[in-house]
């Protein structure tokens, strides 16, 4: 059947529109998953500091010896090599994202420290100086409480709780949101269980600007905390996602076992797309 010459331009416009829409979606989204880390996965990961990758053991963020005994004064991070679009300057829109991961903490002492954090930072983020210990590899202690000195948002799982020693920690083990400075904006009590896997879901809703964390152990014990935050106030337009962990004089190992992440930038309103003299 012949196609009318009047219909062809409309088909061309529709095709171009779909291609542009698909491109916009691909530029504004990121998705990856590691249910179990396998050989070759490290090609898409950036390891920093003392972090090591093993196909059989996952990612060990802080230093351990050949017997698995954790070291003192150690810090390590892992980031995904692909950048994520956090918001769009031209339209001022935000991204939705969801991260799922599991980790295990082990310590030969009762008061092991310091903790692990899921974080989002600028693409060129490196481990700050002197950040082993309580700042969890996220900031230099001298600028830890200076919002303008850091561009990072983190969900921390902090096992250190001697408040009088650093001035920012609550006096209990906790899950907390670190919005730029290291002091948590919102926290909930959390129990570190030596050698047990903690499964975590972190989600961000761009419409409500709500960041929520749900964590649980295999026996069903769960924890939840949420906080409203506008990513545009703290983070650049593009960033990287990853994990950071550290120990000071009190020590423990921090093993990342699985990690998946998805993000989608909310679609730009159709009137922003112009095709020739047509406004879609």
Swiss-Prot record:
InterPro entries: ConA-like_dom_sf, L-lectin, Lectin_legB_Mn/Ca_BS, Legume_lectin_dom, Leguminous_Lectin
Presence of keyword Calcium: yes
Keyword terms, alphabetized: Calcium, Hemagglutinin, Lectin, Manganese, Mannose-binding, Metal-binding, Signal
Single GO biological process annotation from the record: cell-cell adhesion
Pfam family of the protein (one): Lectin_legB
PTM field: Glycosylated.
Function comment: Alpha-methyl-D-mannoside-specific lectin. Has hemagglutinating activity towards rabbit erythrocytes. Binds to cytokinins and significantly inhibits physiological effects of cytokinin activity such as cotyledon expansion and delayed leaf senescence.
PROSITE patterns: LECTIN_LEGUME_BETA
Family label: Belongs to the leguminous lectin family.
Record-listed Ca(2+) binding positions: 158, 160, 166, 169
Residues that coordinate or bind a carbohydrate: 114, 134, 165-166, 248, 250
Assembly notes: Homodimer.
One Gene Ontology MF term: metal ion binding
Ligand binding (Mn(2+)): 156, 158, 169, 174
Signal peptide: 1-26
Domain of life: Eukaryota
Misc remark: The hemagglutination activity of native and recombinant SL-I was not inhibited by cellobiose even at 120 mM, however alpha-methylmannoside and 2-alpha-mannose inhibited hemagglutination at 0.38 mM and 0.39 mM respectively.
Name of the featured protein: Alpha-methyl-mannoside-specific lectin
């Amino acid at each position: 059947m012949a196609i009318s010459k009047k219909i062809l331009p409309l088909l061309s416009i529709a095709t171009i529109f779909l291609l542009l829409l698909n491109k916009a979606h691909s530029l504004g989204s990121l998705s990856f998953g590691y249910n179990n880390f396998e050989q070759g996965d490290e090609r898409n990961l950036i390891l920093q500091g003392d972090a090591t990758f093993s196909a059989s053991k996952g990612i060990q963020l802080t230093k351990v010896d050949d017997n698995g005994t954790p070291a003192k004064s150690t810090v390590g991070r892992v980031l995904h090599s692909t950048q994520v679009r956090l918001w769009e300057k031209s339209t001022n829109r935000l991204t939705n994202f969801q991260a799922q991961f599991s980790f295990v903490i082990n310590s030969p002492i009762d008061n092991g420290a310091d903790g692990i954090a899921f974080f989002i930072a600028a693409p060129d983020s490196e481990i700050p100086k002197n950040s082993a210990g309580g700042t969890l590899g996220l900031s230099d202690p001298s600028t830890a409480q200076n919002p303008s000195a850091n561009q990072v948002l983190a969900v921390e799982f902090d096992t250190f709780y001697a408040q009088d020693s650093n001035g920012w920690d609550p006096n209990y083990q906790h899950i907390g949101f670190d919005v730029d400075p290291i002091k948590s904006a919102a926290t909930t009590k959390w129990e570190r269980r030596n050698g047990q896997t903690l499964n975590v879901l972190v989600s961000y809703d761009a419409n409500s600007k709500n960041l929520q964390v749900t964590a649980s152990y295999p026996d069903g014990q769960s924890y939840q905390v949420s906080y409203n935050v506008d990513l545009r106030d703290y983070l650049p337009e593009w960033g990287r996602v990853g994990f950071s962990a550290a120990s000071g004089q009190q020590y423990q190992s921090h093993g990342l076992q699985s990690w998946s992440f998805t993000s989608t930038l909310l679609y730009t309103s159709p009137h922003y797309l112009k095709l020739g003299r047509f406004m879609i």
